[in-house]
Amino acid sequence: MQLIKILNTPSSMRNNTQRIYERLSRGEFLSVDSTNSTVRHLYEDIEENMDDYADYFKEIGLRLESGNGYFYLSRTVENKQAIESKLESFSKWLDYLDFLKCYNQSFTAGYQFRKSNLIEQISLDIELKEKARHLFKKYGVGSNLEIVNKLLQEMGNMGFAECISEQDETYKVTSAFCYAEELVNMIQIANEDEVPE
């Protein structure tokens, strides 16, 4: 039965399944607006074969999720340790998002910025400097350059931002960044809906 299912899948899907799994299983996102042609190709293949990929990943205990211009994987069943790890990771992204929105309220999908401008702004804005110091305190990251490098590395690893010009170190925020924004909005809505005792 499984062999028949594999033989009936489109050839592009058979060719891309492993590459998609390798990226998404590490917690990365695939964005429609990626500057990386491989990422865009994988995104388009999922979009064209969404039901087939969803069925395939469901068979191995994963759920293919989509947002506004991005795809990611989640587990259908998670143990307590995995949930705690996700909460810790999400807590970290709350701080990142707070910092980035303090830097510029327009910081969202499509936004472009230079690394040097971000470093300079940290030096000029006291509130931003305090938030920056808090971001990676436990890792011993100290200078503004180290903080920004670590943040850009984290954003790049998740697929939330990509370097579009190595010459002047310009970065572009991808559609996948909306995932973090949507999670924060859900928490804010949930907090507003809570009835005080």
Walk through the language-model features, giving the residues of each.
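Short basic alpha-helical hairpin corresponding to helix-turn-helix/winged-helix-like nucleic-acid-binding
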Residues: E65-E120
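Short acidic, hydrophobic short linear motifs in intrinsically disordered regions
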Residues: L30-T38, A109-I122, E127-Y139
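Short, amphipathic alpha-helical interaction segments positioned at domain boundaries
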Residues: S85, A176-E197
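Intrinsically disordered, low-complexity, charge-dense segments enriched in Lys/Arg
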Residues: L152, I164-Q167, T174-Y179
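Eukaryotic partner-binding/assembly regions in large regulatory complexes
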Residues: M1-E84
